Amino acid sequence: MAFQLALDALAPTTHRDPSLHPILESTVDSIRSSIQTYPWSIPKELLPLLNSYGIPTSGLGTSHHPHAAHKTIETFLLCTHWSFQATTPSSVMFMKPSKFNKLAQVNSNFRELKNYRLHPNDSTRYPFTSPDLPVFPTIFMHDALMYYHPSQIMDLFLRKPNLERLYASLVVPPEAHLSDQSFYPKLYTYTTTRHTLHYVPEGHEAGSYNQPSDAHSWLRINSIRLGNHHLSVTILESWGPVHSLLIQRGTPPPDPSLQAPPTLMASDLFRSYQEPRLDVVSFRIPDAIELPQATFLQQPLRDRLVPRAVYNALFTYTRAVRTLRTSDPAAFVRMHSSKPDHDWVTSNAWDNLQTFALLNVPLRPNVVYHVLQSPIASLSLYLRQHWRRLTATAVPILSFLTLLQRFLPLPIPLAEVKSITAFRRELYRKKEPHHPLDVFHLQHRIRNYHSAISAVRPASPPHQKLPHALQKAALLLLRPISPLLTATPFFRSEQKSMLPNAELSWTLKRFALPWQASLVLLALSESSILLHKLFSPPTLQAQHDTYHRHLHPGSYSLQWERTPLSIPRTTAFLPFTPTTSTAPPDRSEASLPPAFASTFVPRPPPAASSPGAQPPTTTAAPPTPIEPTQRAHQNSDLALESSTSTEPPPPPIRSPDMTPSAPVLFPEINSPRRFPPQLPATPDLEPAHTPPPLSIPHQDPTDSVDPLMGSHLLHHSLPAPPTHPLPSSQLLPAPLTNDPTAIGPVLPFEELHPRRYPENTATFLTRLRSLPSNHLPQPTLNCLLSAVSDQTKVSEEHLWESLQTILPDSQLSNEETNTLGLSTEHLTALAHLYNFQATVYSDRGPILFGPSDTIKRIDITHTTGPPSHFSPGKRLLGSQPSAKGHPSDPLIRAMKSFKVSGNYLPFSEAHNHPTSISHAKNLISNMKNGFDGVLSLLDVSTGQRTGPTPKERIIQIDHYLDTNPGKTTPVVHFAGFAGCGKTYPIQQLLKTKLFKDFRVSCPTTELRTEWKTAMELHGSQSWRFNTWESSILKSSRILVIDEIYKMPRGYLDLSILADPALELVIILGDPLQGEYHSQSKDSSNHRLPSETLRLLPYIDMYCWWSYRIPQCIARLFQIHSFNAWQGVIGSVSTPHDQSPVLTNSHASSLTFNSLGYRSCTISSSQGLTFCDPAIIVLDNYTKWLSSANGLVALTRSRSGVQFMGPSSYVGGTNGSSAMFSDAFNNSLIIMDRYFPSLFPQLKLITSPLTTRGPKLNGATPSASPTHRSPNFHLPPHIPLSYDRDFVTVNSTLPDQGPETRLDTHFLPPSRLPLHFDLPPAITPPPVSTSVDPPQAKASPVYPGEFFDSLAAFFLPAHDPSTREILHKDQSSNQFPWFDRPFSLSCQPSSLISAKHAPNHDPTLLPASINKRLRFRPSDSPHQITADDVVLGLQLFHSLCRAYSRQPNSTVPFNPELFAECISLNEYAQLSSKTQSTIVANASRSDPDWRHTTVKIFAKAQHKVNDGSIFGSWKACQTLALMHDYVILVLGPVKKYQRIFDNADRPPNIYSHCGKTPNQLRDWCQEHLTHSTPKIANDYTAFDQSQHGESVVLEALKMKRLNIPSHLIQLHVHLKTNVSTQFGPLTCMRLTGEPGTYDDNTDYNLAVIYSQYDVGSCPIMVSGDDSLIDHPLPTRHDWPSVLKRLHLRFKLELTSHPLFCGYYVGPAGCIRNPLALFCKLMIAVDDDALDDRRLSYLTEFTTGHLLGESLWHLLPETHVQYQSACFDFFCRRCPRHEKMLLDDSTPALSLLERITSSPRWLTKNAMYLLPAKLRLAITSLSQTQSFPESIEVSHAESELLHYVQ
């Protein structure tokens, strides 16, 4: 610590580097050794973890490895840990020879290597297999122990009697017994499936491997015992998932301390030494706590582990806020859940944490702290708190005393009559002498009493006599009260009465209650205590203990006790019998290479019968080592295992006497396991359609995501998916054929139940019912049953039970009935059962269902929806709708009857399409001009011409459309999900004779090629397959348009109108996959309405299945796929040679094509099918992809998709693709969310059509039909005053007075945790206001100037368009004039200067970027150079010189003052904007928004000053929208600095921050002199010219005040890493960052003091503006500073200096009258004078009240404008406003009238008003938001004086 302080002191000097030289020199050797030993590039987030394991890696390696951290751990294990253990000649098992050679060079005791090929992959790792076992007494087993059972290790020790020690490395997550969630997901992930644990190192799927799920049991045993053989198991070291175990022969001797003689002392401090100790092991995990279980619920432990820091912060937060809403804990959790350090926490754990915090908010500890109390009050409090416990303890004791007389019968003295005396005179008994009670006298009386007792009861048992010890004890007890006993009646004489009197004598009698009564009393007392415990709350102590145990749980530690393991038998260590060998002689002296055994032992021949065909047996086969060499640290390729591979060897023959029992910790010993393990077979699939299995199972992408996308799947490891046959619904067994409730063949319903049915209504396939009703639950979507029940008066339950007597269960409960409801097939069955005929009124007209030979009729109405619905009764229509299509057309009839593989074509009717001439004309016009298509651009000037050119043909069609009337043509639309088989049935249809006159139009040449290949027509018929342009020039009877939505809008109309011979159009396409977009900016095709909406009514049904996509993609979309291939969703670093590459842009596609890859854009791939996995390229345009393009990319391949590029584009953040993120993270893709306006309108069918009947579905429950609201996806509006979600409202302490903090209940939940919401820590003293006596001033004399006359000729005649610019062929709009009102001049007065209006000028911000922003060359952080450090130090020294500070001195940090600054900053943030504005900007506190990212937008303003008047186009001022975290954390730092700057600032330096115009006037009058000229300066691009030196300067300023280091580091990090939507920025100043004005002012002041010897010269600074009273000499070191600065000065020597819009001088200050004159003109023409007049008047009064001296401040050219402004206010202002021009103080009532409408009141005008009026104005809702609060500025100026 002292050395660090010394280094900090030497930091500004040149002595720091020599002081650090010894330290750097001492680290060179260790760094060099680390780089040589661990040369791999380790991810930076894993480097601290490896260092905490004790691995000395520097992280400076450059070699890349797919799992570098595991490789580092393995190297440390081998070269350091094992090398230290190998003290004798040793053998090594399961290691590559090359790795063993390196290990042997490190330690020569590694003599022998034994490898065994036990898996096909071993042949690639081990060139030879060893026929024998190791020979040395020490063996090192490398990463194979997890595959061996303890019985096999015991077998190894038994086979090798000389084996003493076995060092084994074990790779298994210690938390595997909790769940599948890793504690270090960046280091490893794993999943457990049945009895297999799949381990993935660092997201590298290719390096993953499988092992038994109980391998972690090796960490739970400490010994292995078999009979008299014992092996001890010791865990030497653990590095996360890698453990080093030592298994050695024998057991350690007992601890001698356990055999020590027991001690007799109760207070033995070493008693635990004589007790056996537990063998407890623990493993390192993140710092976590375990949440309590929910009441009466069982929650997994892994879902209750949360970070301790987050829990403690959330616990404090929920009790610190004044108002807590139900959403606040969830928002607080969200802030922390996205942090990389908490990636190990499960989503359920986060949910449980926020729920636990929310529900336990009301709990508080029931404690009191009473210190200054009397003993009686303390006793009373104790009894009130613990009376239950005292009562519970005392009642049983008191009840037990009732039994004491029964079991210990003590005699009780009772009165007995001795004699009676009557009628005698009064006699007195002899008075005994009165003696003082002393000990001896009392002892005598007690002895006499004891003698009397003995005399009365001589037969008393001996134990009832009072012993002598008891007498002594009684005397000692009575000694203190002996004076009191002398006055008792026991010692007084009694007077006998004259009345008859009985003389009594006392005798001892035995008295005892019955034992039954005693037991009853005891039972009643115990029962009362029990009832009290049952119905009363816990005691205070119990409440206290439960509260702290429940809300303050201890840290969770991953530990358990290790126990011995007993095994009944051994299992063979190897699957073959090894040969015997002897140990070679010790050759440690010679450097001989290790020996390898080169004999390969073949496997035993397979059994005669297949193992799978044998029936299961009760005796399990002994285990064999499972993949013992498939280790975590080896990058093995994915091997394709063919179906002809060698069968695994049979297990070794076991002796019959072996029992099948096995250890509990390793249950795999009892389960038969084939060797080696393969993927699970799928016997229900046909072999022809079953893809060959991979050597690794499919991995969930959430467990294999590499943050840097370094993980990849090698292409050649993926087998080509099977070539699918023709689409058929019989690929998978139909549920109807396997239905156990049915019998017989599958036949149409009308054949099984013959009656007269309407045509095509009873042709659906079914089977006879064989079993009675199974009482299936009634479906939720039962509107059909309700409609039939209402008409037939049969209950819905009876109707449902009747259906279960005629239809199989598979047709009653399936996916269709669950999602679409019951259909007309069920209606037909009901009509047959109940003998009625139903007329269903649908969109197609009335349709009859049910037998025609019945007289009972019912009416049902069917609405299409969605959702569709059956309702009882007939729908009343004005006219009967006519049926669509042309049933008499032979083409359409043929299509309706055509079948492919037993399935009908998925359409209902042909729709008459009326062509639109306007659509066709739009498209042909764009084609003619070359905006859409390329035919008109083809060069046909060369070659033989046989007809018109393509362009001439297009022109002819264009002319033809001018005179051709529109026509109606039948259109059939086939729509469905990607790969549903839309194309194949149409191709089979076109092969028929009736449809031979056809042509096909395709959007791309790739799709046209697929059509040619599939149709297999003669070469002369190839003209029938065309691209969309050439198809228009040809003619046919039938037109097939494939991917209609990829055609230009209006293409269907143009195709119909261009071909008079066309009779039928068949269109194919998926409206969800997007539509055509022209690449020409001049095309007008986009102005036509979308084709998806025009063609939507033609979609009769949408095929919701796929033959293409693999199962992993189908699960995402929740769709059924007939492709049995599992597929893959992964990531690659480089594309594979055969895989197609899908890009976002044509440029990227051309690049990949030029590199030799097969590539196309995502949009152009629509309609294509790939066999290899599609590689999706992720780049900057990924986040802009539409949902349609995302759907296309994910559904192109039969094998899956692989992403290539940065993982941030699939990370689920704002800058990523939502659909790709869902796919990559294995989240369901909800189609309603991605296609909210289109998908709900599609009529889905889930299986191919097997019948052409009019089948209708009802998908609404029996209630009335519901329809989705068009805005169902929009959240409801919540008013700001909403308080029903308040969980708790904490009141302030009563002695704090009224609440001065602003409300925070309206803040977004993500922002509220950023507020400290601290009450004012310091009460400011009362401020006394002093009123300066008014001084008599001469009123100024104005020369006559008429405002209107001067304004009429002020604006020169010019063309506003000449002052605009062109940006990307678009004109700017800074001088709008069209339709703008004007009255003063010949043009609108707004043309005086440029007006910045981002809403009306789209070029404003893009055209200003190059001037206002400075970008870094890359995303890397800005590097602070040596010149930046030097210049920053020079500026800091100059700034200290300006404030008369010592650069090396520091100021102690004041926490109380900083807390007050926090309150001020939050007050300013809450009061500067309205509540609605803060709520609307909730995204500013989004936790997913990186703090270094700012959003740049243009500032809307009409700036009028000398530089902008009559100027041309001007770049806008850019504002930076930063995260609320930055504003709320760094804002107090700047306010804290401002307080000290205000206190230290010399009087000759004026800073305009927080100053009023009156203060500016007073300072000028006091300090400015009459010397001329004065130096005024402004900078060009001041903000952009600040580089790294500004960061150094700001950091040094904060260090001087001892600002906490983490805040300084945060500031430096933000400045060097800032990025925007336009790119990364340099360290430039951003308007909007905390302290922009203060830092600019300090930078400007530091530059001035670096340039001049200022001394006591008055200086004025405000941001980049400055003014020096008179010329100053230049400093000698100024040239060295100037060469490092990037500033561009605009120095001006003037006699009339202008500062912040005011002309200043010794007389005071006056507002620039020229700018004010222009503003008044603009306000008049804009008709906004009433809103702005008061503000302009208050600005004018600042100079007007100076009197005659104001003319000394103005240049002569501005006198007329000052006079014109005075004339304007005198003519246009009402009388009460003109009172401000008077020097006297106006009355408060007058000011209140003046400020009755302060909407456009400026900041300066606000400063001039009294505080009462300012508060009243700021409370108005229409008041303009000010950049800073005046009250806050006033508090800052007064704060330091009473804090210090």
From Swiss-Prot:
Residues 1572-1678 form the RdRp catalytic domain. Residues 609-621 have a biased composition (Low complexity). It comes from the Viruses. One of its GO terms (biological process) is viral RNA genome replication. GO terms for molecular function: ATP binding; cysteine-type endopeptidase activity; mRNA methyltransferase activity; RNA binding; RNA-directed RNA polymerase activity. SUPFAM superfamilies: DNA/RNA polymerases. Residues 946-1103 form the (+)RNA virus helicase ATP-binding domain. A ribonucleoside 5'-triphosphate binds at G976, F977, A978, G979, C980, G981, K982, T983. The record marks S879, Q880, A1259, T1260 as: Cleavage. Keywords: ATP-binding, Host-virus interaction, Hydrolase, Methyltransferase, Modulation of host ubiquitin pathway by viral deubiquitinase, Modulation of host ubiquitin pathway by virus, Multifunctional enzyme, Nucleotide-binding, Nucleotidyltransferase, Protease, RNA-directed RNA polymerase, Thiol protease, Transferase, Viral RNA replication. The active site is at C783 (for protease activity), H869 (for protease activity). A motif (GPP flap) lies at residues 865-867. Its EC number is 2.1.1.-, 3.4.19.12, 3.4.22.-, 3.6.4.-. Residues 728-879 form the OTU domain. Residues 571-729, 859-887 are annotated as: Disordered. This is Non-structural replication polyprotein. It comes from Turnip yellow mosaic virus (isolate TYMC).
